[in-house]
Protein backbone atom coordinates (compact mmCIF):
# COMPACT_ATOMS: atom_id res chain seq x y z
CA UNK A 1 0.00 0.00 0.00
CA UNK A 2 1.27 3.45 -0.85
CA UNK A 3 1.05 5.08 2.56
CA UNK A 4 1.31 8.62 1.23
CA UNK A 5 -1.52 8.20 -1.27
CA UNK A 6 -4.02 5.98 0.55
CA UNK A 7 -7.09 7.62 2.00
CA UNK A 8 -8.47 7.04 5.48
CA UNK A 9 -10.83 4.26 4.37
CA UNK A 10 -8.08 2.33 2.61
CA UNK A 11 -5.72 2.73 5.57
CA UNK A 12 -8.41 1.57 8.00
CA UNK A 13 -9.11 -1.48 5.84
CA UNK A 14 -5.53 -2.69 6.27
CA UNK A 15 -5.47 -5.52 8.84
CA UNK A 16 -2.36 -4.16 10.58
CA UNK A 17 -3.59 -0.58 11.03
CA UNK A 18 -6.22 0.54 13.50
CA UNK A 19 -8.38 3.64 13.25
CA UNK A 20 -6.08 5.76 15.43
CA UNK A 21 -2.96 4.82 13.48
CA UNK A 22 -4.71 5.59 10.19
CA UNK A 23 -5.75 9.02 11.50
CA UNK A 24 -2.17 9.74 12.58
CA UNK A 25 -0.91 8.93 9.09
CA UNK A 26 -3.48 11.26 7.52
CA UNK A 27 -2.76 14.03 10.04
CA UNK A 28 1.01 13.69 9.59
CA UNK A 29 0.65 14.02 5.83
CA UNK A 30 -1.62 17.05 6.24
CA UNK A 31 0.63 18.92 8.67
CA UNK A 32 4.16 17.69 7.94
CA UNK A 33 4.06 16.28 4.43
CA UNK A 34 4.86 12.85 3.09
CA UNK A 35 6.05 10.05 5.34
CA UNK A 36 9.48 8.94 4.17
CA UNK A 37 10.23 6.02 6.49
CA UNK A 38 8.94 3.86 9.31
CA UNK A 39 11.15 5.81 11.71
CA UNK A 40 8.82 8.79 11.30
CA UNK A 41 5.88 6.66 12.41
CA UNK A 42 7.94 5.32 15.32
CA UNK A 43 7.84 8.81 16.83
CA UNK A 44 4.13 8.33 17.59
CA UNK A 45 3.23 6.29 20.67
CA UNK A 46 0.41 4.61 18.77
CA UNK A 47 2.98 2.75 16.66
CA UNK A 48 4.74 0.10 18.71
CA UNK A 49 7.81 -1.64 17.32
CA UNK A 50 5.77 -4.80 16.67
CA UNK A 51 3.28 -2.75 14.63
CA UNK A 52 6.04 -1.28 12.49
CA UNK A 53 7.66 -4.67 11.95
CA UNK A 54 4.37 -6.12 10.71
CA UNK A 55 3.67 -3.15 8.45
CA UNK A 56 7.11 -2.98 6.86
CA UNK A 57 6.36 -5.68 4.28
CA UNK A 58 3.08 -4.11 3.19
CA UNK A 59 3.69 -0.39 2.79
CA UNK A 60 5.70 1.81 0.47
CA UNK A 61 6.63 5.46 0.72
CA UNK A 62 6.32 6.50 -2.95
Pin down the residues of each PLM region.
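Compositionally biased linear targeting/interaction segments
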Residues: 1-62
Amino acid sequence: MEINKAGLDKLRAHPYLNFFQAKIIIEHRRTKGAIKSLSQLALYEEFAEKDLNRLSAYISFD
